[in-house]
């Protein structure tokens, strides 16, 4: 999941019921991967008051306890490879998510149209 998809799904706001149902079904099957980078990005957004999460640790714990998401951690190679991507997208978080999705042969759930320029499968409901 792209970070915004994770935030939207966890808050159940700004997304359709179809989106929520789709992710709930995929999570139950163990098919939803979330990069640990997304938790870092979410914490930064919360700290900067760009999103409202009262307690980031409780938010993360609740998410992990109430879902079957699979956390993936970036490797040193992922980090290096993210710098070698074409410069269509400048956001280092998204570049790393692109590399991780590609490595895991996963579909990246995102509405970020800049990501469409890369060789990674994307999806948005």
For each of these PLM feature ranges, what is it?
Residues 60-87:
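Acidic catalytic patch
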Residues 1-34, 48-62, 104, 113:
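Short, well-structured N-terminal submotif of metal-dependent ribonuclease cores
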Residues 31, 68-70, 121:
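Conserved beta-strand segments of alpha/beta enzyme cores
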Residues 87-93:
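Donor nucleotide-sugar recognition loop
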Residues 5, 38-39, 78, 97, ...:
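Alpha-helix capping/helix-boundary segments
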Residues 66, 96-125:
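Acidic, PIN/NYN-like endoribonuclease modules and their adjacent C-terminal/linker elements
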């Amino acid at each position: 999941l792209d970070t915004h998809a994770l935030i939207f799904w966890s808050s159940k706001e700004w997304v359709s019921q179809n989106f929520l149902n789709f992710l709930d079904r995929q999570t139950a099957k163990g098919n939803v991967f979330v990069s640990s980078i997304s938790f870092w990005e979410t914490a930064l957004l919360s700290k900067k008051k760009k999103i409202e999460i009262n307690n980031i640790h409780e938010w993360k714990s609740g998410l992990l306890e109430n879902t079957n998401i699979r956390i993936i951690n970036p490797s040193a190679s992922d980090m290096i490879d993210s710098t070698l991507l074409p410069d269509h997208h400048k956001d280092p978080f998204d570049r790393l998510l692109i590399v991780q999705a590609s490595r895991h042969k996963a579909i990246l759930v995102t509405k970020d149209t800049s990501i469409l320029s890369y060789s990674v499968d994307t999806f948005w409901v």
